[in-house]
Amino acid sequence: MERRIHARVEVSHPVLYLTDIYPRPKVASTIDLSLGGAKIESLSSLAKDEGLRVSIAIQPEVIECRGKVIYVLERDNGRIEAGIQFEDLTEPNRLYLKQYLFHVMEQRALEATLSVE
């Protein structure tokens, strides 16, 4: 059984990334996000263990860090799904991301509670 250190939250945010191999910006979007990494969807190919620079727009901030591709799945629709592990998230970015993810989880829990009543 797989154990995750950080909770994943399903959210969609724009992503720009540059790979170490091909350093031109490519566009993707998050499928889910955690303090440890992100699952992204892209039209451009990625390779397992590839290093990259990631920018994720979470208004009003942009989270920037280095990352490593942990896995790659090719979907039937031609899109690529990839798991990215964050490698050098700065403390201010980590704190912003933590607060954002907590807020999203709190809002969803509240919405779930209200929909049951």
Which residues make up each language-model segment?
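Short, solvent-exposed secondary-structure boundary/capping segments
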Residues: 38-42, 75-86
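Solvent-exposed residues in well-ordered beta-strands and their adjoining turns
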Residues: 18, 41-43, 57-59, 70, ...
